[in-house]
Every structure is written in structure tokens, then in C-alpha cells.
């Protein structure tokens, strides 16, 4: 069966046909780093981690990029509130992000570009839009002219004539930039510098980029003009992803992405999660009382495009479900030695047996992981039952070779979904450095180099190298690292 996925642009399931056979390029709109991650972030990050893992199991190489927005009004406000800086706030919450994702078993992306590290590409894209007549400077800002792009609204299904901007098309008082726009629907690509805020030189004067242009530039810089999968939460469809399409396709004349995939939002007891309602929960707070594997299972049990209602009943059911799977996964470690089983094995591929085939048939239908889980629960319950016979009766009449195949199959399928009875770090090494630790050390080294404190920069480089981390210094002060 061919993998079919629901494309938000065509509003239909489409067969996956990557631009380059065997390779899937994938971009996810990441977080704005001004606070700790919450349940909505957990749902999004786990969802696309699952998709990436499944594609890899299906034989694809996946090149996965997820950005950090580290220039934003919310970050600046947090910095002011804490008497800190935008850079310090960003570093703090980027490190916290990696800690949270490691706990949830989310594998690191191949690259985490930041807005502040992509400024040259951002300015280059804005200049091209201006040259082609899609952007115009006004009062030190630069705006995108929405009406000049014929395809605007094709992702969200919205038409400009159906949208309202204040009364009778007039700009509302809530839009402080309205007086500088040629049209109420235009949006900022570059914002002029304000007193006390970080700013960068540009052809239009000192300032900082708008939010939407950042992702368009990062996709282009790190993956190319057209990618296979552009993914994110469905709250980003309009205006963010709509604006990305307008920006990128106006310059290239090519589709920004072959497929647009969006996950549903998280609700808490049927209500939208928000701080004002008092139902806002961070990942780290939740992990104090809930097994991270139960959280992954909760995400798996609902279809990724549907809303996920987080309730005590739902998390209890996920916890119970995880206990069942865990008992099945433990079977071979508890009894395999007595049977002479080899406990170290190569995980099974898609066509290994009837259960892997059934799993693939389910998940190939628009990432129906719940259907795949049904196969796993069937195996887990059977293994648990056989384990009870061995525990209480001392023997089982079951075919031991078949039991071994069933156990290896369950372990293999669980690995695809990032479910582990020993949920060790997916992103730490023998030296104990997590991705968050590495990001902090790299940031400290970058600052030392900016301060011309070469001795400290060299010391931090040596610390990282001793931990097995390779640093690659790029133009513009960007440093990439690899294990």
C-alpha cells in the first residue's frame, strides 16, 4: 500500500511522491522561545516526531528542519519583565525546550535554524520581493502587498473580499501600523527599530524582521525553494502559512511545499487551553506526575488532524494502555533468557510478517497511528497472557518460536513510535550532555567570541570536543554542532 497523506492545500489525501526518490524534506514551524513549552507544543512535536520516525522506517531518508523564532515582541517583553536581554531569554527557553523534548523521547531535528542566524537570507528575500513588486517600504518598515499575489488565500480557503479589517475596510485602532500600509491586509516583512529594542542594519534602515518572512527564508536557505512536507499546528494555517506561501511563491514561481500537513489543537476538558482559563499546563509540570510514554501514547491514540482533549480520564486511559504495552515489551527480557532467545536483534522492517504488514497498512492511511496501535495491543495482550501463565503456572503450551517473533515484532513497532520501557535520552551521549546543555555551551562560546575572549572560547570548544561534539563555524557568527 502506498502512503497517502491529507494535504491541507488540496483538501484531499494524496500519495506521497517526494521530489527526490528516497528523500523527504520536511520543515516544521517551531516555537517562539519566550516561555516553557506546554501541552500544545508536546502534541505538535510528538506528532511530527512520529511522522518522521515512520517515514524512516518506511525506507526514506528524512531531512528535518525545525526553526526557533528568537526575535519577537513576546521575547522582548519577557526580557524587560526580567531585566534581562532577548538573547538570554531565548537561550534559557531553547535549553528548556531540549530538556522537555528529550524527556518525551522526541528525536532532535537535523537542524534548528534561528531567525537571528538567518538575517542575511531574510533580507535577501525581502529585497527580491521588493524588486518584483510584491513589497514596498513605508516609514522605515517594509510591507508585503497581499493583493499583488493572485493565489492569496488558497491554503486557508479565505478570500480577501470576505475578510474584514475594521469597519468597511478601514484600519482599526488596534493596528498600530495601519497608517503606513497601502492596504489593511498587508503585513510587515521588516519593522523599523524602536528605542531600546535589538535592531540590525538593512537596506531599509535598522530594524528587525517580521515573523512570517523568517520561515520562508529558513525553508529556502536550509532545504530549498520547494520542499516535500511543510508541517505545523492548524492554528498556523492563517495567517502564518498563508503568508509563507505568498512570500516564497511570489519570488520563486514554484510551490513552497508539495504537501501541507497540520495537526489539531489541544483542549483541556473540552475548552481551549489558555492561561486566562487557568487550564494551562507546561510539559515539565505534567512530567512530574505522568509517565512520558503515557503522554506519547495519548497523542498516538487520536488522529493527528483531530483536536486532542486532555482530561484526567484520557491520561488515565493512556497510562493504563502504556502499562499493557510495557508488560508485553518486558516479556522477552523476563523470560527470553530461559528460552535461549537472543535479546539483541535488528528491528524488523515493514514486510517482515503479518503484524508489520497490518501495522503499515493502518499507518499508511494518513498516519493512522491509532490503527497501528491496535496491532501492537493485540500482541502485547497476548504476550502478557503468556507471561502470566509462566509466572503462575511455570510453563506455557505456546510455540516459543512464534512467541519470540511476536515479541520482536512488538519491540520493533514500539521503537518506530518512540515507545520504550527504558526511555533513555534520544539525544544524550556517554558524557551526559543533553542537546540543551550543548546549546548553552555553544551560546556561551559564541558570546565569548563576540567579546573577543578567545581563551574562554577555546576552553568551551575543548569541553565540547572532549564530549564528542564537532563544531562548524559558519559566516555571520552561526555555529552548527554535530555528535
Swiss-Prot record:
Binding site for Zn(2+): 29, 215, 240, 244
Details of cofactor binding: Binds 1 zinc ion per subunit.
Disulfide cysteine pairs (residue numbers): none
GO MF term set: ATP binding; cysteine-tRNA ligase activity; methionine-tRNA ligase activity; zinc ion binding
GO cellular component terms listed in the entry, alphabetical order: cytoplasm
UniProt catalytic activity: tRNA(Cys) + L-cysteine + ATP = L-cysteinyl-tRNA(Cys) + AMP + diphosphate
Cofactor requirement: Zn(2+)
Keywords: Aminoacyl-tRNA synthetase, ATP-binding, Cytoplasm, Ligase, Metal-binding, Nucleotide-binding, Protein biosynthesis, Zinc
Protein name per Swiss-Prot or TrEMBL: Cysteine--tRNA ligase
UniProt source species: Synechocystis sp. (strain ATCC 27184 / PCC 6803 / Kazusa)
Phylogenetic classification of the source organism: Bacteria, Bacillati, Cyanobacteriota, Cyanophyceae, Synechococcales
Gene: cysS
Amino acid at each position: 500500500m502506498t502512503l497517502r497523506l491529507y494535504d491541507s492545500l488540496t483538501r484531499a489525501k494524496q500519495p506521497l511522491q517526494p521530489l527526490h526518490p528516497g528523500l523527504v524534506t520536511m520543515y516544521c514551524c517551531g516555537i517562539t522561545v519566550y516561555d516553557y513549552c506546554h501541552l500544545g507544543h508536546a502534541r505538535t512535536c510528538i506528532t511530527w516526531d512520529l511522522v518522521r520516525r515512520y517515514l524512516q522506517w518506511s525506507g526514506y531518508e528524512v531531512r528535518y528542519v525545525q526553526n526557533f523564532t528568537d526575535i519577537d515582541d513576546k521575547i522582548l517583553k519577557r526580557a524587560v519583565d526580567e531585566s534581562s536581554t532577548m538573547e538570554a531569554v531565548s537561550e534559557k527557553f531553547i535549553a528548556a525546550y531540549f530538556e522537555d523534548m528529550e524527556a518525551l523521547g522526541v528525536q532532535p531535528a537535523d537542524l534548528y535554524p534561528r531567525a537571528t542566524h538567518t538575517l542575511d537570507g531574510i533580507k535577501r528575500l525581502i529585497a527580491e520581493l521588493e524588486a518584483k513588486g510584491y513589497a514596498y517600504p513605508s516609514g522605515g518598515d517594509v510591507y508585503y502587498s497581499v493583493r499583488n499575489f493572485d493565489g492569496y488565500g488558497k491554503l486557508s480557503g479565505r478570500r480577501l473580499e470576505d475578510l474584514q479589517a475594521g469597519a468597511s475596510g478601514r484600519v482599526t485602532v488596534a493596528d498600530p501600523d495601519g497608517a503606513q500600509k497601502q492596504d489593511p491586509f498587508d503585513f510587515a516583512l521588516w519593522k523599523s527599530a524602536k528605542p531600546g529594542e535589538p535592531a540590525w542594519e538593512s537596506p531599509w534602515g535598522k530594524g528587525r524582521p517580521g515573523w512570517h518572512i523568517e520561515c520562508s527564508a529558513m525553508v529556502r536557505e536550509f532545504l530549498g525553494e520547494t520542499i516535500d512536507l511543510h508541517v505545523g499546528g492548524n492554528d498556523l494555517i492563517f495567517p502564518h502559512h498563508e503568508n509563507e506561501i505568498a512570500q516564497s511563491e511570489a519570488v520563486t514561481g514554484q510551490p513552497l511545499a508539495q504537501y501541507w500537513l497540520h495537526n489539531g489543537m489541544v483542549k483541556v476538558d473540552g475548552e481551549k487551553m489558555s492561561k486566562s482559563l487557568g487550564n494551562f499546563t507546561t510539559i515539565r509540570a505534567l512530567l512530574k506526575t505522568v509517565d512520558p510514554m503515557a503522554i506519547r501514547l495519548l497523542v498516538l491514540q487520536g488522529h493527528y488532524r483531530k483536536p486532542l482533549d486532555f482530561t484526567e480520564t484520557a491520561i488515565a486511559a493512556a497510562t493504563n494502555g502504556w502499562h499493557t504495552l510495557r508488560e508485553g515489551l518486558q516479556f522477552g527480557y523476563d523470560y527470553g533468557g530461559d528460552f535461549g532467545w537472543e535479546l539483541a536483534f535488528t528491528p524488523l522492517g515493514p514486510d517482515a510478517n503479518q503484524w508489520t504488514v497490518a501495522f503499515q497498512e493502518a499507518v499508511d492511511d494518513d498516519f493512522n497511528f491509532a490503527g497501528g496501535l491496535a496491532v501492537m495491543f493485540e500482541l502485547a495482550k497476548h504476550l502478557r497472557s503468556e507471561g502470566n501463565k509462566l509466572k503462575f503456572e511455570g510453563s506455557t503450551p505456546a510455540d516459543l518460536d512464534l512467541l519470540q517473533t511476536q515479541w520482536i515484532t512488538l519491540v520493533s513497532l514500539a521503537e518506530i513510535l518512540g515507545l520504550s520501557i527504558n526511555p533513555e535520552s534520544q539525544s544524550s551521549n556517554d558524557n551526559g550532555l543533553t542537546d540543551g546543555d550543548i546549546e548553552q555551551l555553544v551560546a556561551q562560546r559564541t558570546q565569548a567570541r563576540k567579546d573577543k575572549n578567545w581563551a574562554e572560547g577555546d576552553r568551551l570548544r575543548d569541553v565540547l570536543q572532549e564530549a564528542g561534539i564537532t563544531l562548524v563555524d559558519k559566516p555571520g557568527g552561526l555555529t552548527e554542532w554535530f555528535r
